[in-house]
Regions:
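Extended low-complexity acidic/polar segments
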Residues: 36, 41-46
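Charged helix-capping and loop-helix junction motifs
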Residues: 3-7, 35-36, 85-92
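EAL-family c-di-GMP phosphodiesterase catalytic domain
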Residues: 18-31, 46-167
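Hydrophobic positions in alpha-helices of CheY-like receiver
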Residues: 9, 41, 94-98
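Generic alpha-helical secondary structure signal
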Residues: 1, 9, 35, 135-136, ...
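Bacterial c-di-GMP phosphodiesterase EAL domain
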Residues: 1-13, 26, 40, 55, ...
Length: 167
């Protein structure tokens, strides 16, 4: 598996460090096999991440042992922040726990300046969501890369919190 990935990358002259291999939380059913595969991928230079953490069948009791670089919190965490202060408290505690375990934390589903501010004050490393850019086709993304003065996103120009995609 890892060797096969490396053969393909070598054929096309792609550095494994340029790619991120994502593990979905629901994939953890085969945890032991995945743990070995992720370790092998990391040793080969791949960046590894857990996507949509907290969405599926949680494996919070195993996360400290999984060889990952990043954990991506699913959009449900942001939706809870909009409901009440308990959602914000839960999000902050989750981010703190993941950071204490040595992970970079990315929050998905960010859709407002308020959410960006909450994440900035919570220690979140990276954010993504419709607040920064709606999903783009490859052609639209390519056009955006060459816009002068732009930072790879269509930020809301008239808003105070139009950062470039990171908290």
């Amino acid at each position: 598996t890892t060797r096969r990935y490396l053969e393909i990358l070598e054929k096309y002259k792609v550095d494994p460090g340029m790619l991120e291999m994502e593990l979905k939380e629901t994939d953890t059913i085969r945890y032991e096999n995945i743990k070995d595969l992720l370790r092998s991928l990391q040793e080969a230079g791949f960046h590894t991440a857990l996507d949509n953490f907290g969405v599926g069948s949680s494996f919070i009791n195993l996360i400290a042992d999984v060889p990952l670089n990043d954990v991506k919190l699913g959009r449900g965490f942001m939706e809870k922040c909009e409901k009440d202060y308990r959602g914000i408290g839960f999000l902050r505690q989750m981010i703190e726990m993941l950071k204490n375990l040595g992970f970079q934390v990315l929050c998905e589903g960010v859709e407002s300046a308020r959410q960006v501010e909450i994440l900035k004050t919570s220690g979140c490393d990276h954010v993504q969501g419709n607040w920064f850019s709606m999903p783009l086709s490859a052609k639209e993304f390519e056009k955006m890369l060459f816009l002068p003065g732009e930072i790879f996103c269509r930020c809301r120009k008239n808003e105070e919190h139009s950062t470039g995609g990171e908290a």
